[in-house]
Each structure stands twice: as structure tokens, then as C-alpha cells.
A protein has these predicted regions:
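Residue-level signature of mid-helix packing/kink "hotspots" within the transmembrane helices
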Residues: 33, 61-69, 153-154, 267-275, ...
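Extracytoplasmic gate region of multi-pass secondary transporters
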Residues: 35-36, 221-267, 271
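Helix-to-loop junctions at the C-terminal end of transmembrane segments
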Residues: 67-79, 274-286, 372-373
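Juxtamembrane intracellular "pre-TM" segments in multi-pass secondary transporters
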Residues: 2-12, 194-226
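Helix-loop-helix hairpin linking two adjacent transmembrane segments in secondary transporters
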Residues: 145-193
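Cytoplasmic helix-loop-helix junction between adjacent transmembrane helices
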Residues: 110-148
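Conserved MFS/SLC helix-loop-helix module at the cytosolic interface between two early adjacent transmembrane helices
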Residues: 66-102
Length: 405
């Protein structure tokens, strides 16, 4: 386990900066999950419907999805650290204001501001990690970065509900903003080491081959394939995570307690798979093979769950296997994107492909919700499995394109 997360062999300044970047990513996921556990309390306070309150998430995702790529260009132009600090400061301020003021429309507006802050994380994070990680440790650093985000999602419900019980939902929002400001202070205390790309930015020289890229480069087939990969993994992951419990109940009459354990198994093993995938991607350079294999296993297992009413222990084991297989692919996914990114263009490229998360997360509730409304719970598993297999085709197509070039 020490090998998975150790950065001791890297320069200490770079190590501390990477730790700060991962902490910021943890906060980004923490912030994204804030509304869910506090939804009932906020709705009662504002006296609005669930649909009206859901507008906050819609505004957040639209702003984040539309502006993430332009912010990626900004990362490559002025530097990733300053953009990350600005994004975290903006997010923290938005949630503090949302908790301080008693207006529903201010609350909605602050989710738009938070969406703007959210655009900084992936472009800036991946740029900093790519520039300040040793190549032989990069896949493990990517894995730990992803794991940090999962950790933020995991601790959000319990800490937010604890703060709500003492200070109300507004106090919970302000407390979360304070957490973000603490991480911000850590980032401010860690200056970015002067790597070659920083020297070029400071001297005003050409910003390396990728710094001047535009939209024409981003719509190249190799980049669009990665956008599709991010979109499809978000589509299958968000849908299955959200609808697994109700689909199992409707299809097989699975008790809610067992279905919840199955979901917990999927999520926990997904996180473990990410860490294992970081080590694997560092040892095996065929990242496309790792991604394709993991998605094939996940798709096959998901289809199996949709076909058969399995004993509880086997169901829990298979959902865990599916989660582990998908998690195994994430570090390789990031390495595949990095492989097609010119030096100096990490912000723009990672910002662009990361919009796939917003696209997939927006489509998933519609498709999976329609399947449940049409009383087709089996379709939840078959659709998720099919998307996983289509995702495999994007990996293999991208690999064939790179070989042809």
C-alpha cells in the first residue's frame, strides 16, 4: 500500500504540491455531493419543490460543462496553479454565500458560481500532475488523485449531516466552505517548482508545442475518442450507481438491505480498483489493453446480474468485481489521454475530455429513468453492459488510429 501512494522519491516541493492538488480534488467531489444529504432540509427552508431545487444542479453542470474547455486553455496560458487556487477560492466563497443568505435565487446563482469554480479542477490538476510527477510514478499519482476524489464523496454525507445536526444546513454549507479555505491555505503555502514549462511562461517565450493549440486540435479523432470514452464511462457509472438498488428490487425483489450492500461493494471495490490500476498501469505499458479488459469484465458481469437472480453472496461479490474492474481502468484512461496530448496543452485537452463527465451525468438520469418508468429494470443492466462494450470499441479504435499515425 505504501508503494501505491508514496511520493517520497520525488522532489519534496513537487510532492507537497501534488498532495495539495489531490486535497483540492477531494474538496471538489465533496462540494459536488453537498446538496444530496441536505436536500430535505434545504427544500423545507426555502419551501420549494424538488424540481425547483434540482435547478441548482442543472445550473452547476451547464456552467461547468460549457466553460471547462475555455478554462483549460487559460490553464495553458497563465499557469495551472493560479487557476486551481482561483477555482477553489471561488467554489468555497460560493458555498459560504449560499449558506449565509436566505434567498432561493441567491442559492441557485451561487451554484452557477460554484460551477465556474469547478471548471478549474480537472484541467489544472492534470496539468500540475503531468508536469511535476516522475514518469515512472505518474500512473500511481493519477490513481491517488482519482482516489482522493472518491474519498471526498465518501466523507461528505456523514460530515455534512453531523454539521447540520448542530448548526443547521446553512452551518453545514459554511463549515464546508471553511474546509475548502483550509485546503486553499495549504495550496497557497506550496509554491510551484520552476519546471521548464513555467520558465517558458515567465519568460514570454513560445509555450511549447501544445500551448498554441485551438479547437481544431481538440476535434481531432484521437481527442474526440477520449471525449467519448469519458462520456460513456460516466453514462454507465452514474446510471448503475443511481439505479442499482431500485432495479434489483423491481427485477428480483432483492431486499433493500442486500441491494445497499451490493452497491457499497461496488463503490468500495471501485476505489480499491483505482489504486491497483495505478500500480498496474505503471508496470504494464499497454494502457489500452488494461482499459479494454476492465470494461469487458465489467460489462459481462453487469449483463450476468441482469440475466440471473443470484444468491445474495454471489450478487455482492459480482457487483464488487464489476466495480473493481472499472476502477482498474481509470489510471490507464488518464495515461491514454496524456499520451495524445502535446506538451503544454494538458489543461485544454483534459478540460475538453472531462466535459464527458458532465455529458454522461446529464444523459444518464433520462435514459435510466425512462427504463424504470417503462418497467424495464432488466434494461438497466443490459444498457449499462452495452455501454461498457461500446466503450471498449472507443479504446480499440483510438489505439488503431495511433498505430496508423
Amino acid at each position: 500500500m505504501t508503494q501505491l501512494i508514496s511520493v517520497r522519491t520525488m522532489p519534496s516541493a513537487g510532492s507537497r504540491l501534488i498532495a495539495g492538488v489531490c486535497a483540492a480534488h477531494m474538496m471538489s467531489h465533496y462540494y459536488m455531493l453537498m446538496l444530496a444529504p441536505l436536500l430535505a432540509f434545504i427544500r423545507a427552508d426555502f419551501d420549494v419543490s424538488y424540481t425547483q431545487l434540482a435547478l441548482a444542479l442543472t445550473v452547476f453542470n451547464v456552467v461547468s460543462g460549457v466553460l471547462q474547455t475555455p478554462v483549460g486553455f487559460l490553464v495553458d496560458r497563465i499557469g495551472a496553479r493560479v487557476v486551481l487556487i482561483g477555482g477553489l477560492a471561488l467554489s468555497s466563497a460560493a458555498y459560504a454565500i449560499a449558506g449565509l443568505f436566505g434567498s432561493y435565487w441567491i442559492f441557485i446563482a451561487m451554484y452557477g458560481v460554484a460551477g465556474l469554480g469547478n471548471t478549474a479542477y480537472h484541467p489544472a490538476d492534470y496539468s500540475l500532475l503531468s508536469h511535476h510527477s516522475r514518469p515512472d510514478r505518474l500512473s500511481q499519482i493519477f490513481a491517488f488523485h482519482t482516489f482522493a476524489g472518491m474519498l471526498g464523496s465518501a466523507i461528505a454525507p456523514v460530515t455534512l449531516l453531523a454539521m447540520q445536526s448542530f448548526f443547521g444546513w446553512r452551518g453545514a454549507y459554511i463549515g464546508a466552505a471553511i474546509f475548502g479555505l483550509i485546503v486553499l491555505a495549504v495550496l497557497l503555502a506550496q509554491p510551484e517548482p520552476i519546471a521548464e514549462h513555467r520558465r517558458e511562461l515567465r519568460s514570454g517565450k513560445s509555450r511549447a508545442p501544445g500551448a498554441a493549440i485551438g479547437w481544431r486540435f481538440l476535434v481531432a479523432p484521437t481527442i474526440l475518442i477520449n471525449l467519448a470514452f469519458f462520456t460513456l464511462t460516466a453514462l454507465t457509472g452514474n446510471g448503475l450507481n443511481t439505479y442499482l438498488i431500485v432495479a434489483l428490487g423491481a427485477l428480483y425483489g432483492t431486499p433493500a438491505a442486500i441491494a445497499n450492500i451490493a452497491l457499497t461493494s461496488l463503490l468500495a471495490m471501485n476505489a480499491i480498483g483505482v489504486l491497483a490500476g495505478g500500480v498496474l498501469a505503471g508496470r504494464i505499458r499497454q494502457h489500452a489493453l488494461i482499459a479494454a479488459s476492465g470494461l469487458t469484465v465489467a460489462g459481462a458481469v453487469t449483463a450476468l446480474i441482469g440475466l440471473f437472480d443470484l444468491p445474495s453472496a454471489l450478487l455482492i461479490g459480482l457487483t464488487g468485481l464489476s466495480g473493481f474492474a472499472v476502477g482498474l481502468t481509470y489510471p490507464s484512461r488518464d495515461m491514454l489521454v496524456r499520451a495524445v496530448t502535446p506538451p503544454g496543452a494538458f489543461g485544454a485537452v483534459f478540460g475538453f475530455v472531462s466535459t464527458g463527465f458532465n455529458i454522461g451525468a446529464s444523459i444518464a438520469p433520462i435514459v435510466y429513468g425512462m427504463l424504470m418508468d417503462q418497467r424495464q429494470p432488466r434494461g438497466i443492466f443490459f444498457f449499462s453492459a452495452a455501454v461498457s462494450l461500446v466503450c471498449v470499441s472507443t479504446v480499440t479504435f483510438g489505439l488503431s488510429r495511433r498505430r496508423a499515425e
